[in-house]
């Protein structure tokens, strides 16, 4: 199953008060183009593979394949069929500043992984299925 979406939405304040600034992933993406697709941020719970990462004016856009040959990929496939469509980034903040409201503006992030989740911290961090090999879903 091929999916794509926004893993991080620039300038959207998430549930924790963080707001990712445009360009926050630039250095991280220069260092690596390979980050795991995890199930709910669980280390080792590989659900698939991300094949594309791109910073756009909207945020960090991703594309990847859910691998139903893997246990967490099968679980993800089942949950996606029930409406799961959230994405969440795992990261280490490199540069940030606090805002007067107590939240953080995240200026530079070291991306670690992108997870499939039910309830993303950033409401706009969502994906959609763009291709499936399961003919039952197409019919």
Indicate residue ranges for each PLM-predicted region.
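N-terminal "first-domain core" detector
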Residues: 1-25
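Residue microenvironments linked to proteolytic maturation
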Residues: 2-4, 11-12, 52-139
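Acidic/polar N-terminal loop/beta-strand segments that form early-domain functional surfaces
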Residues: 8, 40-42, 65
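Short, solvent-exposed polar/charged micro-motifs at secondary-structure junctions
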Residues: 16-17, 46-48, 98-101
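A short, contiguous, amphipathic alpha-helix enriched in charged residues
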Residues: 22-37
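Short conserved beta-strand and strand-loop elements enriched in small hydrophobics
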Residues: 33-43, 87
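Short, structured beta-strand-loop surface elements
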Residues: 40-58
């Amino acid at each position: 199953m091929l999916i794509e979406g926004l893993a991080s939405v620039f300038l959207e304040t998430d549930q924790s008060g963080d707001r990712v600034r445009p360009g926050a992933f630039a250095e991280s993406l220069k260092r690596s183009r390979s980050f795991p697709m995890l199930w709910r941020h669980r280390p080792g719970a590989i659900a698939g593979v991300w094949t594309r990462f791109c910073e756009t004016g909207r945020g960090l856009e991703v594309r990847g394949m859910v691998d139903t040959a893997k246990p967490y990929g099968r679980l993800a496939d089942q949950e996606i069929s029930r409406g799961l469509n959230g994405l969440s980034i795992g990261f280490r903040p490199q540069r940030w500043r606090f805002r007067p409201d107590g939240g953080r503006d995240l200026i530079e992030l070291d991306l670690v992984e992108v997870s499939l989740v039910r309830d993303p911290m950033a409401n706009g961090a969502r994906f959609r299925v763009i291709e499936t090999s399961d003919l039952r879903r197409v019919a």
